Protein backbone atom coordinates (compact mmCIF):
# COMPACT_ATOMS: atom_id res chain seq x y z
CA UNK A 1 0.00 0.00 0.00
CA UNK A 2 1.41 3.36 -1.03
CA UNK A 3 0.92 6.73 0.66
CA UNK A 4 -0.55 9.09 -1.89
CA UNK A 5 -1.41 12.78 -1.82
CA UNK A 6 -3.36 14.41 -4.64
CA UNK A 7 -2.94 18.20 -4.76
CA UNK A 8 -5.87 19.75 -6.56
CA UNK A 9 -9.24 18.04 -6.16
CA UNK A 10 -11.07 19.08 -9.30
CA UNK A 11 -12.39 16.61 -11.87
CA UNK A 12 -8.97 15.07 -12.51
CA UNK A 13 -7.75 15.06 -8.92
CA UNK A 14 -10.93 13.57 -7.52
CA UNK A 15 -10.99 10.86 -10.18
CA UNK A 16 -7.34 10.00 -9.50
CA UNK A 17 -7.90 9.97 -5.75
CA UNK A 18 -10.95 7.70 -5.91
CA UNK A 19 -9.18 5.24 -8.19
CA UNK A 20 -6.20 4.95 -5.84
CA UNK A 21 -8.50 4.48 -2.85
CA UNK A 22 -10.34 1.70 -4.67
CA UNK A 23 -6.95 0.11 -5.42
CA UNK A 24 -6.26 -0.09 -1.69
CA UNK A 25 -3.90 2.83 -1.18
CA UNK A 26 -3.93 5.44 1.59
CA UNK A 27 -4.97 8.65 -0.17
CA UNK A 28 -5.41 12.25 0.96
CA UNK A 29 -6.80 14.87 -1.40
CA UNK A 30 -5.68 18.47 -0.93
CA UNK A 31 -7.62 21.47 -2.18
CA UNK A 32 -7.75 25.17 -1.31
CA UNK A 33 -11.57 25.21 -1.31
CA UNK A 34 -13.03 24.39 2.14
CA UNK A 35 -16.40 23.69 0.53
CA UNK A 36 -14.89 21.19 -1.87
CA UNK A 37 -12.94 19.54 0.94
CA UNK A 38 -16.11 19.24 3.02
CA UNK A 39 -17.92 17.63 0.09
CA UNK A 40 -15.09 15.15 -0.42
CA UNK A 41 -15.06 14.22 3.25
CA UNK A 42 -18.83 13.79 3.18
CA UNK A 43 -18.41 11.38 0.28
CA UNK A 44 -16.04 9.24 2.32
CA UNK A 45 -12.68 10.50 1.10
CA UNK A 46 -9.84 11.86 3.22
CA UNK A 47 -9.35 15.50 2.27
CA UNK A 48 -7.77 18.63 3.69
CA UNK A 49 -6.97 22.20 2.73
CA UNK A 50 -3.28 21.95 3.66
CA UNK A 51 -0.70 19.37 2.64
CA UNK A 52 1.11 17.86 5.62
CA UNK A 53 3.88 15.33 5.04
CA UNK A 54 5.15 15.19 8.60
CA UNK A 55 5.36 11.61 9.74
CA UNK A 56 5.46 10.41 6.14
CA UNK A 57 8.92 9.00 5.29
CA UNK A 58 7.97 8.70 1.63
CA UNK A 59 4.97 9.32 -0.58
CA UNK A 60 3.69 10.00 -4.07
CA UNK A 61 2.45 13.58 -4.44
CA UNK A 62 0.39 14.10 -7.60
CA UNK A 63 -0.11 17.65 -8.88
CA UNK A 64 -3.54 17.80 -10.51
CA UNK A 65 -4.16 21.54 -10.52
CA UNK A 66 -5.75 23.42 -13.45
CA UNK A 67 -3.56 24.87 -16.21
CA UNK A 68 -5.91 27.06 -18.26
CA UNK A 69 -4.62 28.64 -21.45
CA UNK A 70 -4.92 32.28 -22.44
CA UNK A 71 -3.40 34.66 -24.99
CA UNK A 72 -0.01 34.30 -23.31
CA UNK A 73 -0.11 30.49 -23.26
CA UNK A 74 -0.57 28.11 -20.36
CA UNK A 75 -1.32 29.71 -17.00
CA UNK A 76 1.04 27.84 -14.68
CA UNK A 77 0.43 29.91 -11.56
CA UNK A 78 -1.50 27.09 -9.90
CA UNK A 79 1.35 24.68 -10.68
CA UNK A 80 3.87 27.07 -9.17
CA UNK A 81 1.72 27.64 -6.09
CA UNK A 82 1.10 23.93 -5.58
CA UNK A 83 4.81 23.23 -6.01
CA UNK A 84 5.61 25.77 -3.29
CA UNK A 85 3.12 24.13 -0.97
CA UNK A 86 4.64 20.73 -1.67
CA UNK A 87 8.11 22.12 -1.03
CA UNK A 88 7.07 23.64 2.29
CA UNK A 89 5.52 20.34 3.36
CA UNK A 90 8.66 18.42 2.38
CA UNK A 91 10.80 20.91 4.30
CA UNK A 92 8.65 20.52 7.40
CA UNK A 93 8.86 16.74 7.13
CA UNK A 94 12.64 16.89 6.92
CA UNK A 95 12.84 19.31 9.83
CA UNK A 96 10.82 16.91 11.92
CA UNK A 97 13.27 14.13 11.16
CA UNK A 98 16.09 16.33 12.36
CA UNK A 99 19.24 17.88 11.06
CA UNK A 100 20.42 14.63 9.49
CA UNK A 101 17.50 14.63 7.12
CA UNK A 102 17.53 18.39 6.57
CA UNK A 103 21.20 18.59 5.69
CA UNK A 104 21.57 15.29 3.86
CA UNK A 105 24.07 15.54 1.02
CA UNK A 106 22.76 15.67 -2.51
CA UNK A 107 22.52 12.33 -4.21
CA UNK A 108 21.93 11.79 -7.89
CA UNK A 109 18.28 10.92 -8.47
CA UNK A 110 19.43 8.32 -10.97
CA UNK A 111 20.90 6.21 -8.16
CA UNK A 112 17.86 6.20 -5.89
CA UNK A 113 16.29 2.79 -5.29
CA UNK A 114 13.18 1.27 -3.78
CA UNK A 115 12.63 2.00 -0.13
CA UNK A 116 14.39 5.35 -0.03
CA UNK A 117 12.88 7.98 2.21
CA UNK A 118 11.98 10.63 -0.33
CA UNK A 119 8.81 12.02 -1.80
CA UNK A 120 8.02 11.50 -5.48
CA UNK A 121 6.48 14.66 -6.90
CA UNK A 122 4.45 13.78 -9.99
CA UNK A 123 3.12 16.32 -12.47
CA UNK A 124 -0.26 14.99 -13.57
CA UNK A 125 -1.60 18.27 -14.97
CA UNK A 126 -1.28 19.02 -18.67
CA UNK A 127 1.71 21.35 -18.99
CA UNK A 128 4.15 22.47 -21.69
CA UNK A 129 7.30 20.35 -21.97
CA UNK A 130 9.92 21.37 -19.43
CA UNK A 131 7.50 22.37 -16.68
CA UNK A 132 8.37 19.51 -14.34
CA UNK A 133 12.13 20.05 -14.49
CA UNK A 134 12.21 23.83 -14.95
CA UNK A 135 9.33 24.97 -12.72
CA UNK A 136 8.13 22.22 -10.39
CA UNK A 137 11.56 20.90 -9.41
CA UNK A 138 13.28 24.23 -8.68
CA UNK A 139 10.21 25.55 -6.84
CA UNK A 140 10.00 22.48 -4.61
CA UNK A 141 13.74 22.65 -3.95
CA UNK A 142 13.65 26.32 -2.91
CA UNK A 143 10.62 25.91 -0.69
CA UNK A 144 11.85 22.72 0.97
CA UNK A 145 15.51 23.55 1.41
CA UNK A 146 16.34 20.14 -0.05
CA UNK A 147 17.69 19.05 -3.39
CA UNK A 148 16.20 16.85 -6.04
CA UNK A 149 17.51 13.38 -5.40
CA UNK A 150 17.87 13.96 -1.66
CA UNK A 151 14.50 15.07 -0.31
CA UNK A 152 12.38 14.49 -3.39
CA UNK A 153 12.41 13.12 -6.92
CA UNK A 154 10.45 14.18 -9.98
CA UNK A 155 8.30 12.48 -12.58
CA UNK A 156 5.65 13.38 -15.13
CA UNK A 157 2.53 11.26 -15.51
CA UNK A 158 0.08 13.31 -17.61
CA UNK A 159 -3.60 12.52 -17.52
CA UNK A 160 -5.57 11.30 -20.54
CA UNK A 161 -9.04 11.77 -19.09
CA UNK A 162 -12.29 12.82 -20.69
CA UNK A 163 -14.57 15.04 -18.65
CA UNK A 164 -17.63 12.84 -19.06
CA UNK A 165 -15.83 9.63 -18.05
CA UNK A 166 -12.88 10.81 -15.95
CA UNK A 167 -13.20 8.22 -13.19
CA UNK A 168 -13.57 5.31 -15.61
CA UNK A 169 -10.61 6.60 -17.61
CA UNK A 170 -8.44 6.40 -14.48
CA UNK A 171 -9.72 2.95 -13.53
CA UNK A 172 -9.30 1.51 -17.04
CA UNK A 173 -6.80 3.67 -18.92
CA UNK A 174 -6.03 3.10 -22.58
CA UNK A 175 -2.61 4.70 -22.15
CA UNK A 176 -0.38 5.54 -19.19
CA UNK A 177 2.77 7.58 -19.75
CA UNK A 178 5.58 8.02 -17.21
CA UNK A 179 8.64 10.21 -17.72
CA UNK A 180 11.52 10.58 -15.26
CA UNK A 181 15.26 11.17 -15.49
CA UNK A 182 15.75 8.32 -13.04
CA UNK A 183 14.86 4.90 -14.38
CA UNK A 184 14.17 3.63 -10.88
CA UNK A 185 11.84 6.53 -10.16
CA UNK A 186 9.97 5.79 -13.38
CA UNK A 187 9.76 2.10 -12.52
CA UNK A 188 8.48 2.81 -9.00
CA UNK A 189 5.74 5.03 -10.39
CA UNK A 190 4.98 2.52 -13.13
CA UNK A 191 4.61 -0.23 -10.53
CA UNK A 192 2.03 1.93 -8.75
CA UNK A 193 0.08 2.52 -11.96
CA UNK A 194 0.46 -0.83 -13.72
CA UNK A 195 -2.42 -2.58 -11.88
CA UNK A 196 -4.87 -0.26 -13.64
CA UNK A 197 -3.93 -1.89 -16.96
CA UNK A 198 -3.65 -0.37 -20.40
CA UNK A 199 -0.63 0.46 -22.52
CA UNK A 200 2.17 1.64 -20.20
CA UNK A 201 5.02 3.69 -21.71
CA UNK A 202 8.16 4.73 -19.79
CA UNK A 203 10.41 7.55 -21.00
CA UNK A 204 13.74 8.81 -19.71
CA UNK A 205 12.65 12.42 -19.27
CA UNK A 206 9.59 14.25 -17.94
CA UNK A 207 9.70 16.42 -21.05
CA UNK A 208 8.95 13.46 -23.30
CA UNK A 209 5.88 12.50 -21.28
CA UNK A 210 4.71 16.12 -21.24
CA UNK A 211 5.11 16.43 -25.01
CA UNK A 212 3.29 13.13 -25.58
CA UNK A 213 0.26 14.57 -23.78
CA UNK A 214 0.35 17.86 -25.67
CA UNK A 215 0.76 16.08 -29.02
CA UNK A 216 -2.05 13.67 -28.11
CA UNK A 217 -4.50 16.50 -27.49
CA UNK A 218 -3.37 18.57 -30.47
CA UNK A 219 -3.59 15.61 -32.83
CA UNK A 220 -7.14 14.96 -31.65
CA UNK A 221 -8.03 18.63 -32.08
CA UNK A 222 -6.52 18.69 -35.56
CA UNK A 223 -8.49 15.65 -36.70
CA UNK A 224 -11.73 17.15 -35.38
CA UNK A 225 -11.06 20.41 -37.23
CA UNK A 226 -10.17 18.48 -40.38
CA UNK A 227 -13.51 16.70 -40.39
CA UNK A 228 -15.33 19.94 -39.62
CA UNK A 229 -13.75 21.43 -42.74
CA UNK A 230 -14.71 18.37 -44.79
CA UNK A 231 -18.25 18.53 -43.40
CA UNK A 232 -18.61 22.05 -44.82
CA UNK A 233 -17.69 20.74 -48.26
CA UNK A 234 -19.97 17.72 -47.90
CA UNK A 235 -22.84 19.93 -46.81
CA UNK A 236 -22.38 22.22 -49.80
CA UNK A 237 -22.54 19.16 -52.07
CA UNK A 238 -25.48 17.53 -50.29
CA UNK A 239 -23.37 14.59 -49.13
CA UNK A 240 -23.60 12.91 -45.72
CA UNK A 241 -20.29 13.79 -44.05
CA UNK A 242 -20.72 10.89 -41.62
CA UNK A 243 -20.63 8.36 -44.45
CA UNK A 244 -17.38 9.86 -45.71
CA UNK A 245 -15.76 10.01 -42.28
CA UNK A 246 -16.59 6.46 -41.23
CA UNK A 247 -15.34 5.08 -44.54
CA UNK A 248 -12.07 7.03 -44.50
CA UNK A 249 -11.48 6.05 -40.87
CA UNK A 250 -10.96 2.50 -42.07
CA UNK A 251 -9.31 3.18 -45.42
CA UNK A 252 -6.74 5.96 -44.99
CA UNK A 253 -3.21 4.78 -44.32
CA UNK A 254 -2.94 7.15 -41.36
CA UNK A 255 -5.85 5.34 -39.71
CA UNK A 256 -5.20 1.77 -40.85
CA UNK A 257 -1.47 2.00 -40.02
CA UNK A 258 -1.00 4.96 -37.64
CA UNK A 259 2.68 4.19 -36.97
CA UNK A 260 3.51 4.59 -40.65
CA UNK A 261 2.14 8.13 -40.76
CA UNK A 262 3.68 9.13 -37.42
CA UNK A 263 7.19 9.53 -38.82
CA UNK A 264 8.50 13.08 -38.80
CA UNK A 265 11.32 14.84 -40.60
CA UNK A 266 10.34 14.80 -44.26
CA UNK A 267 7.48 16.24 -46.31
CA UNK A 268 4.76 14.14 -47.85
CA UNK A 269 5.35 13.61 -51.53
CA UNK A 270 4.40 11.30 -54.35
CA UNK A 271 1.90 11.71 -57.14
CA UNK A 272 -1.29 11.80 -55.09
CA UNK A 273 -0.87 13.61 -51.79
CA UNK A 274 0.54 16.88 -53.12
CA UNK A 275 -1.73 16.88 -56.18
CA UNK A 276 -4.89 16.15 -54.20
CA UNK A 277 -4.13 18.70 -51.51
CA UNK A 278 -3.58 21.49 -54.03
CA UNK A 279 -6.45 20.39 -56.23
CA UNK A 280 -8.97 20.10 -53.42
CA UNK A 281 -8.07 23.56 -52.09
CA UNK A 282 -8.89 24.97 -55.51
CA UNK A 283 -12.11 22.93 -55.66
CA UNK A 284 -13.20 24.27 -52.24
CA UNK A 285 -12.54 27.82 -53.39
CA UNK A 286 -14.82 27.21 -56.37
CA UNK A 287 -17.52 26.22 -53.86
CA UNK A 288 -16.92 29.46 -51.99
CA UNK A 289 -15.38 27.68 -49.01
CA UNK A 290 -12.12 28.43 -47.28
CA UNK A 291 -10.17 25.50 -45.85
CA UNK A 292 -7.61 27.13 -43.54
CA UNK A 293 -6.48 23.85 -41.98
CA UNK A 294 -5.83 22.13 -45.30
CA UNK A 295 -4.17 25.30 -46.53
CA UNK A 296 -1.87 25.25 -43.51
CA UNK A 297 -1.04 21.58 -44.18
CA UNK A 298 0.05 22.47 -47.70
CA UNK A 299 2.03 25.46 -46.43
CA UNK A 300 3.90 23.44 -43.81
CA UNK A 301 4.71 20.77 -46.37
CA UNK A 302 6.14 23.33 -48.78
CA UNK A 303 8.36 24.74 -46.05
CA UNK A 304 9.69 21.26 -45.33
CA UNK A 305 10.61 20.75 -48.97
CA UNK A 306 13.05 23.66 -48.82
CA UNK A 307 15.63 22.58 -46.15
CA UNK A 308 18.39 20.19 -47.21
CA UNK A 309 17.91 16.53 -46.38
CA UNK A 310 20.67 16.75 -43.76
CA UNK A 311 18.62 19.23 -41.75
CA UNK A 312 15.57 16.99 -41.97
CA UNK A 313 17.64 14.03 -40.83
CA UNK A 314 18.75 16.00 -37.77
CA UNK A 315 15.17 16.99 -37.00
CA UNK A 316 13.99 13.40 -37.21
CA UNK A 317 17.04 11.95 -35.42
CA UNK A 318 18.14 10.10 -38.50
CA UNK A 319 14.75 8.71 -39.48
CA UNK A 320 14.16 10.24 -42.90
CA UNK A 321 11.27 9.00 -44.99
CA UNK A 322 12.52 7.28 -48.14
CA UNK A 323 10.59 9.32 -50.66
CA UNK A 324 11.46 7.07 -53.58
CA UNK A 325 10.19 4.03 -51.69
CA UNK A 326 7.02 5.96 -50.84
CA UNK A 327 6.48 6.66 -54.53
CA UNK A 328 7.09 3.00 -55.43
CA UNK A 329 4.53 1.91 -52.84
CA UNK A 330 2.09 4.49 -54.14
CA UNK A 331 2.62 3.32 -57.73
CA UNK A 332 1.65 -0.20 -56.73
CA UNK A 333 -1.84 1.08 -55.89
CA UNK A 334 -2.36 2.84 -59.22
CA UNK A 335 -4.26 0.90 -61.89
CA UNK A 336 -2.32 -0.24 -64.91
CA UNK A 337 -2.95 1.76 -68.08
CA UNK A 338 -5.50 0.35 -70.49
Task: Label each PLM-derived region with a short phrase.
Residues 1-52, 56, 60, 322, ...:
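NAD(P)+-binding Rossmann beta1-loop-alpha1 motif at the extreme N-terminus of oxidoreductases
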Residues 57-58, 118, 173:
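Local beta-strand N-terminus motif with an aromatic residue
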Residues 63-65, 124-125, 179:
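Short, well-ordered coil/turn residues at beta-beta hairpins
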Residues 66-71, 208-209:
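A short, flexible beta-alpha/helix-coil linker loop
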Residues 69-160:
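Rossmann-like NAD(P)(H) cofactor-binding subdomain of soluble oxidoreductases
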Residues 138-157, 162, 166-256, 283-289, ...:
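Internal alpha-helical scaffold of NAD(P)-dependent oxidoreductase catalytic cores
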Residues 235-338:
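NAD(P)-dependent Rossmann-like dehydrogenase/reductase catalytic/cofactor-binding core
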Amino acid sequence: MARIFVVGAGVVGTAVGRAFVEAGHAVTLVDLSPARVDALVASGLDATTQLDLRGEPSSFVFLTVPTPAGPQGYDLRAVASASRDVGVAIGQAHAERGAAGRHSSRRDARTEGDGYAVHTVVTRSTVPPGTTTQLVGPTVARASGTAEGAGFVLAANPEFLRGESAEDDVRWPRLTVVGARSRRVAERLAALLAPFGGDLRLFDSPETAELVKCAHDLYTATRISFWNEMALVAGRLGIDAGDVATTVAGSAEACADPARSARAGAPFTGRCLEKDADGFLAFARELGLGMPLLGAVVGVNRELVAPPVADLRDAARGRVLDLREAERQEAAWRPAPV
